[in-house]
Amino acid sequence: MSEKLYPVLPEAKKNTLIDNETYLEWYEESVSDPDGFWAKHGRRIDWFKPFTKVKNTDFNGDVTIKWYEDGVTNVSYNCIDRHLKSRGDKVAIIWEGDNPYIDKKITYRELYENVCRMANVLKKHGVKKGDRVTIYLPMIPEAAYAMLACARIGAVHSVVFAGFSPEALAGRIVDCESTFVITADEGVRGGKPVALKENTDTAIDIAAKQYVMVNKVLVVRRTGGKVSWGRGRDLWYHQEVASVEPHCEPEPMNAEDPLFILYTSGSTGKPKGVLHTTGGYLVYASMTHQYVFDYHDGEIYWCTADVGWVTGHSYIVYGPLANGATTLMFEGVPNFPDQGRFWEVVDKHHVNIFYTAPTALRALMGAGDEFVTRSSRSTLRLLGSVGEPINPEAWEWYYNVVGDQKCPIVDTWWQTENGGILITPLPGATDLKPGSATRPFFGVKPVLVDNEGNVQEGVADGNLCISDSWPGQMRTVYGDHKRFIETYFSTYKGMYFSGDGCRRDEDGYYWITGRVDDVLNISGHRLGTAEIESALVSHHSVSEAAVVGYPHPIKGQGIYCYVTLMTGADAQDPDELRKELVQHVRKEIGPIATPDKIQFAPGLPKTRSGKIMRRILRKIAEDESGALGDTSTLADPGVVDDLIENRQNKK
């Protein structure tokens, strides 16, 4: 843990929206009078019918979470229409293509027309309020248009990251019974095409076998690559939008009407459809965007995430646009054409606020400072980090080399389930400690509990829970409220359990220590070990598999797989079989789930009741076999010796 303290920079303090005094005052009000506080801040968005009820939440029993429940509004209206009068000609989205010579600026007025046209196309093909629309698009402006068009007509979008495989896409189509898909002919990433339409066709075939029929596929022409065509089903986006009006009335939505479903990995099998609703989500996303990034009108803001992840939803699209900001969307990758790309984009578009993930920073740090220092970065004012805890070395590099010691770093902790940032510094209010997410945002009440559920006071380590609701919180797991309660509210009664471990220091600062359940954090993206295990076991040579994380210098965590083979399968060349299994997992889930290490084992360490002792597997994967603890409960302690002997990452 870093003991270094970086006081608030004078420059950051000078123009800040929130200084320390204001933070302490607002925070106190937000936790002592949540109704009064959130009533006031709920008015930051426009309501067609104002709310009279603010907070109606209960973390016990059947768990109900409702905010502003009698208010009526529309997210698309708040992100576009209400800005037209005062800033219609202001740039809403700067799009930077994969190719550094291609970019596009879209004003709020152009955004309005594009979104209205797409909304009218959806309506023309029978999409109604409450219908689920699957969006499987690269980082192109049409991805934002599609999300906002769904919000405009009251359809519920489910964005699937364009790096996911056809199998993963199919699972998400089936779970929410989506009959309309929006995709592109191909994506472009690092100069290479990504076969999105082909993947979509495969996914639709898989979904059909599970009796979910996709009726229409709207295809954006991105590359002009050759694609197969389903007559009567497939529609070209450019042809469809040309035939409809550029105006579409926003559907009046109740604050608790669903806005989107976003699938996230859990510690058990299939991904969970996290459901966010309309009013509270937008209040929270826009408020955190404004105050965490200390956003001032006219600034250029860039979050490098993909819209396939929650960070892209809240901090590329909804938060910034609700605030009338200029938000940058980047199609490419940090190392194409070379490792200086991020900083060239910063210079090219005069970026003031930059928000990225530690995994990208670690990779760029390894490439050397000259890729950074050849750019000026003189417009940068604030840096942010998201996705996983940032190690102090990467933090220092980010602060000293990228930010030239003049940009505060907001190290933000939050999750898909949270809708927006929960623990974070505020640039004009919070002294910084490298590696610490520091203090809770307004209305957020973090609690550390031990494994028995006892609340820990003062300096402590524990499981991170939140003891009361905030407006951006997810409402349920789509179609499975029981799973929602079991996952988040059954471990510690009356509290939301994050699944993360955490330490609180003597200044009341929070330090996230990583997952405490069977979920991996790979490059800032969550993957369930059960998901990867079931992909491995679906291969004909594999009898059993156990997956754990281990420290990885770039990705934060790497994927370590222990595999027991079917009888006879061990006759295969182990290196060939490893390659085959890696490809198999990539096909089942996507490149994000590529195993880093595969260890073949005659057996796995199990208790007499048949439970795999993951703690032991984790220690071996971390090359800490001296710290295995008690192995006396194992059915066959001899298995452990073989695992240690053949471990894949001996130091």
Swiss-Prot record:
Acetylated. Deacetylation by the SIR2-homolog deacetylase activates the enzyme. PROSITE patterns: AMP_BINDING. It catalyses: acetate + ATP + CoA = acetyl-CoA + AMP + diphosphate. One of its GO terms (biological process) is acetyl-CoA biosynthetic process from acetate. Pfam families: ACAS_N (PF16177), AMP-binding (PF00501), AMP-binding_C (PF13193). One of its GO terms (molecular function) is metal ion binding. The modification N6-acetyllysine is found at residue 611. CoA binds at residues 189-192, 311, 335, 523, 586. It is an enzyme of class 6 (ligase). Its cofactor is Mg(2+). One of its GO terms (cellular component) is cytosol. Belongs to the ATP-dependent AMP-binding enzyme family. Catalyzes the conversion of acetate into acetyl-CoA (AcCoA), an essential intermediate at the junction of anabolic and catabolic pathways. AcsA undergoes a two-step reaction. In the first half reaction, AcsA combines acetate with ATP to form acetyl-adenylate (AcAMP) intermediate. In the second half reaction, it can then transfer the acetyl group from AcAMP to the sulfhydryl group of CoA, forming the product AcCoA. This is Acetyl-coenzyme A synthetase. The lineage of its organism: Bacteria, Pseudomonadati, Pseudomonadota, Alphaproteobacteria, Hyphomicrobiales. The gene is acsA.
